[in-house]
From Swiss-Prot:
It comes from Rotavirus A (isolate RVA/Cow/Thailand/61A/1988/G10P7[5]) (RV-A). A motif (YGL motif) lies at residues 448-450. This is Outer capsid protein VP4. Disulfide bonds join 318-380. The record marks 231-232, 241-242 as: Cleavage. In group A rotaviruses, VP4 defines the P serotype. Some rotavirus strains are neuraminidase-sensitive and require sialic acid to attach to the cell surface. Some rotavirus strains are integrin-dependent. Some rotavirus strains depend on ganglioside for their entry into the host cell. Hsp70 also seems to be involved in the entry of some strains. A motif (DGE motif) lies at residues 308-310. Residues 510-776 are annotated as: Spike foot.
Length: 776
């Protein structure tokens, strides 16, 4: 029998203990190693103190006093005061438009009587009679001419305690300060070409915006702030204030800060995200009118696009969260169209798109701050999906649409077939759109959302354009790479492959022929015949067997066998010894609302049901440890496992132990077991349903829980491959003899094969249902 594989694994589990002991002895050798972690030894943290990151503030902060700058000829920006701070007498500043006005300002110290002095103005020496009758204030005198070779004449004056002077170009005029501190005023001279007036200061100066003119006037009247008069303030060249005009790049790498070991890099990127949905459509067994599941699943997509003239290779993984489960049942007949479950995403759902490309931004994505993104919206509309029925017109699922709106971005790791990628996860919230979706020839209509049947609508991909920005802490030396904190372990990679393998296994259920399964279930499958078809296991058969037994030893089945005797004894002794009760699932079922039954009877049914469910959960353990001639559920599950392994293209020696252990636990969850006492049969399922009936007539009788408890302790336990409902349905429709009934009750494989060879639809449908329960 095919279930020999499970018995062999249970019987030889001692080999695992020996193997583990050998490995434990070999791993006891220790070595002392001293590691100097250095100054950056904080486990899991970057060598900096992270703050909240940058916080955007719409307020524009403009400095009041910009400077001081060293004397140099430059084009004074329009709308800015130049505040001059000379240290001694002489020419302070010159300004001209080179066409109709030349202005030179000289400074005279206090207490000067009328005298002639020589000044160099605009490159020529000129003698000027000057005087300053004030004993405390310095005097600024404007010397002006209107022709290149003309004579200078005196203009306005400024008497100052602070020895400060101001000049500005604005509104086609050249403005200066006049009067006497602390009550100075401004005056403007009309200049023909004021925007091109060149100013040459001969002293240190400051730049003050016209919007801060009141502050400039305050400085001239009362002097500069104290900090500007310390030795720590050093004038710099005016060229340091110049900002080179350049075209802003949408895709750039900016060094935010840098030390000897680390630097912060800001990466700005324009991106194009292409993604697609994937789905899984599984049909139920039977005549072909039932669908078990239509669901979303993660989809990987790799593509290339051009960014700033450079080809970029990108990879996306699209997944969904918060799906809504719908179902449709057209009736109870085998030929009635039905969908057990189909998924739809709508307003309460989210779509996650993990994005990675081969640019520098994703090279060292470990310590990241200031992560932001801005993406366009995209509308996703479904296409048609036809449910291909064996006969009649096909129902078609049509319509359905949602719009994806960006809702945030975080760091993530996406897994490909060969490598893990540090990536960005873009989260999208959904809004339903027209049209609604319907299933033609059914009552399903005017439902909103995106169903999983054909979510891409025939498109190869959906596309979203946008950009992201982030600041990443990376090594200062570009040749170094930081370790991936969320690196892929062997177990994570195995889990990913197991998920793909589970999906493949579940889809292979429809490819297994029922007649082939019965033959395979009767073969004595052992470990080596089970995995003989797996590539690369012939040379490693010994280690493969050890790995399988080690994994199987920790399974629920193996851990329960050691407690088999006590569990059965305790369960049998704890049941209520009531005389009888009607069968669950009969015409007068306790699951129905029967007015004739009292509340006490219903409570008794519930109690007996829980007790029967508890006992039936132990019956598999007894059956697997006692050999019978009939076929059991483990024969079928092992045969299905072998058939799927032979057809699988993804199973390998690493995943095989997990597959064996998981199959032993999850294949055929809903099982029923029976015991026979003469002409009476007692049948109990793991779902709590129970029946008692006559073998010859298949008439139900009261269920004696006490007798059932005694029988399961002392009699052989038989798998109800053909359960009571199927058996009664077969008898009512076709009629069966007493001998056939006994053989079906004992799960005789030859009789089962005979019914299948005759293409009996009821028996065949029952076996197909068991195959569909063999899911990981």
């Amino acid at each position: 029998m095919a279930s020999l594989i499970y018995r062999q694994l249970l019987a030889n589990s001692y080999a695992v203990d020996l193997s583990d002991e050998i490995q434990s002895v070999g791993s006891e050798k220790n070595q002392r190693v001293t590691v100097n972690p250095g100054p950056f030894a904080q486990t899991g943290y970057a060598p900096v103190n992270w703050g909240p990151g940058e916080v955007n503030d719409p307020t524009v902060v403009q400095p009041v006093l910009d400077g001081p700058y060293q004397p140099a000829s430059f084009d004074l920006p329009v709308g800015n005061w130049m505040l001059l701070a000379p240290t001694g007498p002489g020419v302070v500043v010159e300004g001209t438009d080179n066409s109709g006005r030349w202005l030179s300002v000289i400074l005279i110290e206090p207490g000067v009587t009328s005298e002639t002095r020589t000044y160099t103005m605009f490159g020529s020496s000129k003698q000027v009679v000057v005087s300053n009758v004030s004993d405390t204030k310095w005097k600024f005198v404007e010397m002006m001419k209107t022709a290149v070779d003309g004579d200078y004449r005196n203009g306005g004056t400024l008497l100052s305690d602070t020895k400060l002077y101001g000049m500005m170009k604005y509104g086609e005029r050249l403005f200066i300060y006049e009067g006497e501190t602390p009550n100075v005023t401004t005056k403007g001279y009309i200049v023909t070409n004021y925007a091109s007036v060149e100013v040459r200061p001969y002293s240190d100066f400051y730049i003050i915006s016209r919007s801060q003119e009141s502050a400039c006037t305050e400085y001239i009247n009362n002097g500069l702030p104290p900090i500007q008069n310390t030795r720590n303030v050093v004038p710099v060249a005016i060229s340091s204030r110049s900002i080179k005009q350049r075209e802003e790049q949408a895709n750039e790498d900016i060094i935010v800060s840098k030390t000897s070991l680390w630097k912060e890099m800001q990466y700005n990127r324009d991106i194009i995200i292409r993604f697609k949905f994937d789905n899984s459509i599984i049909k139920s067994g039977g005549l072909g009118y039932k669908w078990a599941e239509i669901s979303f699943k993660a989809a990987n997509y790799q593509y290339n696009y051009i960014r700033d003239g450079e080809e970029v290779t990108a990879h996306t993984t699209c997944s969904v969260n918060g799906v809504n489960d719908f179902s449709f049942n057209g009736g109870s007949l085998p030929t009635d169209f039905a969908i057990s479950r189909y998924e739809v995403i709508k307003e309460n759902s989210y779509v996650y798109i993990d994005y990675w490309d081969d640019s520098q931004a994703f090279r060292n994505m470990v310590y990241v701050r200031s992560l932001a993104a801005n993406l366009n919206d995209v509308m996703c509309s479904a296409g048609d999906y036809s449910f291909k029925l064996p006969a009649g017109q096909w129902p078609v699922m049509k319509g359905g649409a949602v719009t994806l709106h960006t809702a945030g971005v975080t760091l993530s790791t996406q897994f490909t077939d060969f490598v893990s990628l540090n990536s960005l996860r873009f989260r999208f919230r959904l809004a339903v759109e027209e049209p609604s979706f319907t299933i033609t020839r059914t009552r399903v209509s005017k439902l909103y959302g995106l169903p999983a049947a054909n979510p891409n609508g025939g498109r190869e991909y959906y596309e979203v354009a946008g950009r992201f920005s982030l600041i990443s802490l990376v090594p200062s030396n570009d040749d170094y790479q930081t370790p991936i904190m969320n690196s892929v372990t062997v177990r994570q990679d195995l889990e990913r492959r197991l998920n793909e393998l589970r999906e493949e296994f579940n889809n292979l259920s429809q490819e297994i022929a029922v007649s082939q399964l019965i033959d395979l279930a009767m073969l004595p499958l052992d470990m080596f015949s089970m995995f003989s078809g797996i590539e690369g296991t012939v040379n490693a058969a010994k280690s493969m067997a050890t790995n399988v037994m080690r994994k199987f030893k920790s399974s629920k089945l193996a851990s329960s066998v050691s407690m088999l005797t006590n569990s059965l004894s305790d369960a049998a002794s704890s049941v209520s010894r009531s005389s009888s009760i009607r069968s669950i699932g009969s015409t007068a079922s306790a699951w129905a609302n029967i007015s004739e039954q009292t509340q006490d009877a219903v409570s008794e049914v519930a109690t007996i049901s829980s007790q029967v469910s508890q006992i039936s959960g132990k019956l598999r353990l007894k059956e697997i440890t006692t050999q019978t001639e009939g076929m059991n559920f483990d024969d079928i599950s092992a045969a299905v496992l072998k058939a799927k392994i032979d057809r699988s293209i993804q199973v390998d020696q690493n995943a095989f132990p997990d597959v064996i252990a998981e199959a032993s636990e999850k294949f055929i969850r809903n099982r029923a077991y029976r015991v026979i006492d003469g002409d009476e049969a007692f049948e109990a399922g793991t779902d709590g349903r129970f029946f008692a009936y006559k073998v010859e007539t298949l008439e139900e009788m009261p269920f004696n829980i006490g007798k059932f408890a005694d029988l399961v302790t002392n009699s052989p336990v038989i798998s109800a491959i053909i359960d009571f409902k199927t058996l009664k349905n077969l008898n009512d429709n076709y009629g069966i003899t007493r001998e056939q009934a006994f053989n079906l009750l004992r799960s005789n494989p030859k009789v089962l094969r005979g019914f299948i060879d005759q293409n009996d639809p009821i028996i065949k449908n029952r076996i197909e249902q068991l195959i569909m329960q063999c899911r990981l």
